[in-house]
A protein has these predicted regions:
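Terminal targeting signals and extreme-terminal segments of soluble enzymes
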Residues: 1-217
């Protein structure tokens, strides 16, 4: 079913441009977004250091990880779990995504597009925006013993998602996605992610609040 994108011009300044985007399908609003664009310029710079983690070349491939975990995955989710994805992931912690053991609200994983992308930075930003949703909400579930796949026990949803692009990058080269969840309260989990190139450059950040409501037994 086609989606209509309605773009509204909010502001055009010397350095900044702002737009709002509404996605409409079958007469219903299904998505809205506020977008801010800025010209490039020289200025003050600093950044967080990249976490000290193994390189993606030292870790199991996504396919190797899925094969290793397939006997531990619920049958109802196995087909989707084994299917090839548009984003390749190499988990640093090598966690079973369906293991309900409690853990710290941190996660690191290497991500990249599965195929070669054109030399257009907007495409790379779009691909990374898509990938930035992966694993983010589930970080706030870990301290409470709910795995990334605990859908039978939790009512979950992404409530909002914000992203900032700091520096240029390629989404078809390995990027470290370093996730943490500073807080969960009121049945909502607050999650953050910083994205680094292999040489340690911080290129993007994401923030997401997600519903993590425990279902009645």
């Amino acid at each position: 079913m086609p989606i209509l994108y309605d773009v509204q011009r909010i502001r055009d300044g010397k350095s900044f441009t702002t737009r709002t985007v509404n996605a409409i399908q079958n007469g219903e609003y299904i998505f809205n977004m506020s977008v801010s664009f800025k010209i490039s310029e020289e200025g003050l710079e600093h950044q967080f250091e990249m976490p000290d983690v193994p390189s993606p070349e030292e870790l199991k491939s996504d396919r190797e990880f899925r094969e290793e975990m397939k006997d531990k995955i619920p049958k109802a989710m196995l087909e989707g779990f084994l299917r090839d994805k548009p984003i390749e992931i190499r988990n640093v912690e090598n966690l079973n995504p369906f293991d309900n053991e409690k853990g710290e609200p941190f996660k690191n994983m290497w991500i990249k597009a599965s195929g070669k992308l054109p030399d257009n930075h907007l495409i790379h930003q779009g691909v990374l925006a898509y990938a930035s949703d992966m694993g983010l909400r589930g970080t706030s579930q870990r301290p409470h013993g709910f795995s990334f796949g605990a859908y039978e026990k939790l009512q979950v949803a992404s409530l909002d998602h914000a992203m900032w692009f700091h520096r240029e990058f390629r989404a078809d080269e390995w990027l470290l996605y370093s996730l943490d969840s500073p807080s969960a309260s009121n049945a909502n989990g607050f999650n953050r992610g910083n994205i680094f190139t292999q040489d340690g450059k911080l290129v993007a950040s994401a923030v997401q609040e997600g519903l993590i409501r425990v279902k009645d037994k």
